[in-house]
Amino acid sequence: MKITILSGGTGTPKLIQGFKEILPNEDISVIVNTGEDTYIGDIYLSPDIDTVLYTFSNLINDETWYGLKGDTFFCHEQLKNFGFDEVLRIGDKDRALKMHKTSLLKKGVPMSEIVDIERKSLSINSKIYPMSDEKIESKVLIEENNEKILLKFHDFWVSRRGNAKVLDIFYENSNYAKAADGVLKAIEESDFVIIGPSNPITSIGPILSISEIKDALKEKLVFAVSPIVGENPVSGPAGTLMHAKGYPVNAVGVYEYYKDIVDVLVLDNSDINKKKEMNCEVLYANTIMKTIDDKITLARNILDYYKSR
């Protein structure tokens, strides 16, 4: 059995940890958001890609879901001494991966090739794909002092810590972007696809904004795991961003956002009263993944539901 997972950098990696314990890793493919990619100084950051790489290689700092567990920050601190204060702390070992990407990108190597080199270097048997080899940027339109300002998502969430009135979200350059090499084949060869519990607007939305990916998903059985429990996102700014796009911050809003492609919506047990408002199948489970057992159980629940259909 082969599956493909759509992932951002938080939420979904927990589910990936569950699936990689119950399926042969070579049968798992992951398509990852790159809409938050940016430069800090001369270093190229692809945060969601790196988080997925570290998740599969059991290196992820699972307290922050960013960077490597046990990393040191000598370079970051030394740069501060020279007057260069990085807005994001980059660990020393993590910096090596980012320098590798930066070097190859400057040589014109496509991101999909770079990620494939890195996954092999980290002894990862699963396939990991950026959503596109083309540059797509998630932009957040905010209002500040009666002025409209368009920010990169990284600037909105990291530099400003999400403290702004959000008016809208855009995916710059997505209208003409193509899926990265291998993405459409991974979807086609999968028995089913899982949209993980990442932020729908800025983690999954950029992937779906690529028309050929969305069209391919319409031909497959698609599960979507809600990142909202009750009226609260499990983590991150999903609530603020869903509200800005006109969706209610609850399970119904998640359904409305995914309704063109979702066949089975996976909701937390506490949202059992929401099914009547959705025109799709609903699987209830514990979607709050605090332990490895929680992660494995949710993955197994999805797998068992698929087998029982």
Swiss-Prot record:
Its cofactor is Mg(2+). GO terms for molecular function: LPPG:FO 2-phospho-L-lactate transferase activity; magnesium ion binding. 7,8-didemethyl-8-hydroxy-5-deazariboflavin binds at residues 50, 89. Pfam families: CofD. Keywords: Magnesium, Transferase. HAMAP family: CofD. Homodimer. Belongs to the CofD family. This is 2-phospho-L-lactate transferase. It comes from Methanococcus maripaludis (strain DSM 14266 / JCM 13030 / NBRC 101832 / S2 / LL). The lineage of its organism: Archaea, Methanobacteriati, Methanobacteriota, Methanomada group, Methanococci.
